[in-house]
Every structure is written in structure tokens, then in C-alpha cells.
Amino acid sequence: MASTSLCAANPSASQNLRKVSGFVENKTTQCSFSIESILGLEQKKDGAAVKPHRPWMDGCMHQLGDPHLQIPVVSYENSLFHANSNLMQEEKVLNCEKYFSVTVTERLSFKRELSWYRGRRPRTAFTRNQIEVLENVFKMNSYPGIDIREELARKLDLEEDRIQIWFQNRRAKLKRSHRESQFLMVKNNFTSSLLE
């Protein structure tokens, strides 16, 4: 309302206001960083969706001739989003799923390879005899030197680093059990003092 009274009082102000509003209405340029352009939802003048910039996909799509290796690009114009989806699109998706499905043994082998890649080795299963010998040595010395560990490795047919890890784990187990026994002792003393 204030602008109408201002425009009525000053004709040049109303003319300037019309120029500015006309400029804003006529301005149709869109920013390249708009939400629509980032999401790839921009429409060209003919109504077709603008292809989003995905150079990592473009290289794969052009180099691979096998249609099973091509990953379908999902867009809102895709018929899979509509109730009347065509069979060809469904067939492509099924082929893609079939190609990427793997058996249980393949998954396990891949998991082993992946864990190897991360630096993890398979777990060592110690025999009863090996554990008995290691426990006897641990009772005498919980921190054996390299010479004792190498001798044990030769006798038990194990790698020296496995023996070193066994002793580290055994010391951690002893420390944990010691802590738990102290906790139980304190707990028992506390409960008995409460009962008295």
C-alpha cells in the first residue's frame, strides 16, 4: 500500500518500479549451481531432461560394449518410476541383477581376499599339545624373548610371530581375569558389609 501511494505521488518512481519489476520478470537465466541443475532435473526448452554431468559413468558406458556391464542411470523420466513400466527396462534391470549376483563361495573368497588386503591373516588354530606347551612356558615366563619364541616355533611347527601374538593375547587374558577377580572380591566385601 505504501508503494501505491508513493507511486501516485511520484510518477517517475512508479515508472522506475515498473522497470525493475519488468526486469525481474523477464530475467530467465538460471544459475548453473541451482538445485535442479545439481540433481540433473533441469528441463531443456523441448522438455527433455538435461543429462547430469557424470564423467565416471560416461567413460564406462562408452568403453564397455557388453550391455550387462552397463549400469542403468536412474532418472525421474525413467519408465520404472511410472506404473506402466515397459518390459525392456525390467529386463535390463534383471540382467544387471543377474550379472552382479554372486554365489556364497565367491563371497567368502572375496571376503578372504578383502581381509588379506586390509592386512589381516587367517586365524591360527592351535592344537591341544601346542597350547599345553605354550601354557607351561607362560607359567614360567610371561614375557619370553626372541630366542625362546624361535625355539618354540621350531618345536611346535609354528611361525614365531604367531607365538608372539599368542603370548600377547595370553597376557591380556591374565590381566582381564585379574581385574575381574579384583572386582568380584570388592563386590563381595561390599555386599557382606551391607548385610552386617
From Swiss-Prot:
Matching InterPro entries: HD, Hesx1, Homeobox_CS, Homeodomain-like_sf
Biological process (GO), any one: pituitary gland development
Keyword Mitochondrion assigned: no
Keywords associated with the record: Developmental protein, DNA-binding, Homeobox, Nucleus
GO molecular function: DNA-binding transcription repressor activity, RNA polymerase II-specific; RNA polymerase II cis-regulatory region sequence-specific DNA binding
PROSITE patterns per record: HOMEOBOX_1, HOMEOBOX_2
Gene Ontology CC: one annotated term: nucleus
Subcellular localization(s) per the UniProt record: Nucleus
Pfam entry (one): Homeodomain
Chief location of this protein within or outside the cell: nucleus
DNA-binding region (UniProt annotation): 119-178
Keyword DNA-binding set for record: yes
Entry similarity comment: Belongs to the ANF homeobox family.
Purpose of the protein: May be involved in the early patterning of the most anterior region of the main embryonic body axis.
Classification via PANTHER family: HOMEOBOX EXPRESSED IN ES CELLS 1 (PTHR46966:SF1)
Record-given protein name: Homeobox protein ANF-1
The species this protein was found in: Gallus gallus (Chicken)
Source taxonomy: Eukaryota, Metazoa, Chordata, Craniata, Vertebrata
